[in-house]
Amino acid sequence: MAAALLARASGPARRALCPRAWRQLHTIYQSVELPETHQMLLQTCRDFAEKELFPIAAQVDKEHLFPAAQVKKMGGLGLLAMDVPEELGGAGLDYLAYAIAMEEISRGCASTGVIMSVNNSLYLGPILKFGSKEQKQAWVTPFTSGDKIGCFALSEPGNGSDAGAASTTARAEGDSWVLNGTKAWITNAWEASAAVVFASTDRALQNKGISAFLVPMPTPGLTLGKKEDKLGIRGSSTANLIFEDCRIPKDSILGEPGMGFKIAMQTLDMGRIGIASQALGIAQTALDCAVNYAENRMAFGAPLTKLQVIQFKLADMALALESARLLTWRAAMLKDNKKPFIKEAAMAKLAASEAATAISHQAIQILGGMGYVTEMPAERHYRDARITEIYEGTSEIQRLVIAGHLLRSYRS
């Protein structure tokens, strides 16, 4: 599948309906910094995004439309299972490749980017790392082609950042586990065919009593809540999962009982690289939009880009974007080289998400009134960017993670 993904790079370049900026402005990082295979991957994903995602992104947002046809095509390219070994149906690529692909896909459509991120990082990621051979065959391979996608159920109505305070329970009963409780803010909920679900198997042990389970969807005892009407990323569904005596087989536990909190935290560490990359894609397309508009908008007899105040804004936007990209790539490469990357992933996610919000905010300012109307994509980029500072660990949580690692290094 990796070969199929890379082969697409040799096709002709395709232009999207919006900006010449798509191809002209985004050239900073595609030459000597990347191996040839990663450059080919970048071009493949960019071509796909131009042809398949950019033209539908506004409709996806406006109509809360799940991009089913595009997700299926992404599965055929290996984009939904990028670091899954080829023998399990994946692309067999590394996390740097995943970061590059996530950015390009998210540039085309942020909703599609998060759908891709959840399936890769949050659903397949923990099964690959902690699952048995049998679980990988049953719960990974069917989710690589785009026919099925998964979701990740950790947060609850009463806890988000406090992941160890799970009130959802799982009790052993004969040859089954019985789940009760509600999981909240679940991305891909309405389209998912399976979920990694975290529940307490021993409340007395607090976070050491949390376990992870593989749950098919739909299944008796599991009800979906309403689709949330969100500010951004409106093409991905978000809903509660409600468990009422939901019975699953005993072998549905992922890892060992009590390993759930560890599995969740390690999964989020990986996922933050994906969300950082999504934020980079949003930031890049917002910058492209701002530059393209400023180059063509005349004021005082010259393009806006002749004004120093606009030049300074664009310089600050580019600085924030490039800095965040380097942090993201570093985190991905550390993971690929099996080195500690928790602090670096937190830094990447923090820098990229805050850059995306700031850059999309400034893009609206540069466009002025045109930035405030849906005729232009700038307002959508701003709405899409905001969630990247919240999900998979808020900016405040990232700062706690970074500070904790920093202080431990000084005290050791």
From Swiss-Prot:
One of its GO terms (biological process) is fatty acid beta-oxidation. Changing residue 380 to W: In ACADSD; loss of acyl-CoA dehydrogenase activity. Keywords: Acetylation, Disease variant, FAD, Fatty acid metabolism, Flavoprotein, Lipid metabolism, Mitochondrion, Oxidoreductase, Phosphoprotein, Transit peptide. Its EC number is 1.3.8.1. Its cofactor is FAD. GO terms for cellular component: mitochondrial matrix; mitochondrion; nucleus. The keyword Ribosomal protein does not apply. Belongs to the acyl-CoA dehydrogenase family. Short-chain specific acyl-CoA dehydrogenase is one of the acyl-CoA dehydrogenases that catalyze the first step of mitochondrial fatty acid beta-oxidation, an aerobic process breaking down fatty acids into acetyl-CoA and allowing the production of energy from fats. Homotetramer. It is linked to Acyl-CoA dehydrogenase short-chain deficiency: An inborn error of mitochondrial fatty acid beta-oxidation resulting in acute acidosis and muscle weakness in infants, and a form of lipid-storage myopathy in adults. This is Short-chain specific acyl-CoA dehydrogenase, mitochondrial. It comes from Homo sapiens (Human). The lineage of its organism: Eukaryota, Metazoa, Chordata, Craniata, Vertebrata. The gene is ACADS.
